[in-house]
Amino acid sequence: MEVQSLTITTNYPPKPASPNPQDIRDTIRSNKTNENLWIQRKDVDTTLRSALEHLKACCIVLNLSAKCDERLNVAVSHGTTEKYQLMSRTGSSDNLKAAVTLLDDNVIQAEVTVKYPKAGGGYYRAVAQPDVQWKLQQLQDLGNHISRVTITLCDLQHEVNLLKGDGERDAFTLATGARILEELKLTMNEISLARNSIMLPRKRSLLELCYFPPTRKFVPPLPQDQLISFYISCCRLVCASYQMVPKTVHPQGLSVFMAESQLPHLDDVIKHLNTVMAILQKLINYLSATMS
């Protein structure tokens, strides 16, 4: 019996052409550009509106109606005096106690009771009602930074509205996206400075305190070996007493007592600033990721 061979012929489809790397790059670039333009059209204005609402709240709390951008429509207001009792953080030390009355960023009155062995009764007590301007520079810086941010973002919002055109045709390009991104980064830096102004302590040197005019306004006068300082740290008003002592008593020749009080309105400001930074950073990330 004859065996017949069986031949199977298979027609394979032609090998697909390898994708052109340049075509892939062009497609990716085109997709990024479209996404960037979409973000400019849909996200930027919404984000700016939200950020400005939080900044407006800060301006109201800090009475910045005269400093912030008028387009926020912050009602004109006048600050009211607030008196704060400053105590040792441990709550048990009576080395230093103070009462400070603030009007916005100004110290109106300061009362101090500090342990001082050379004084009668072992304590030095004094009141200062300075007839010279006594500003807490950190609070003033906070207001200035926030005010500058409101102006920058209001200007940017106006520019974005102009780019939107009549609604049917807009003028958004990658160049406008780059400019928006640059302004947002500058704004973030300004907000960071605002936060740092009340989170990080900024103390005057002992030499500066010696020549600081309000220091000389205590009645009775401060002893020659005693200095008093007020500053902001972590949203707290801090009073520090510095007394020169023999190095046999303290190696540095300086005895320091501190008392403090939380400033609730600064806690509110920090919360708003943190929110603004979060939403602006999200927009910055989107724009940065879609820049070709």
Curated annotation (Swiss-Prot):
It is found in: Nucleus envelope. InterPro entries: RAVE2/Rogdi (IPR028241). Residues 1-12 have a biased composition (Polar residues). Keywords: Nucleus. The keyword Nucleus applies. It holds the Pfam family Rogdi_lz. Its main location: nucleus. The keyword Nucleus applies. GO terms for cellular component: nuclear envelope; RAVE complex. Residues 1-25 are annotated as: Disordered. Belongs to the rogdi family. This is Protein rogdi homolog. It comes from Caenorhabditis elegans.
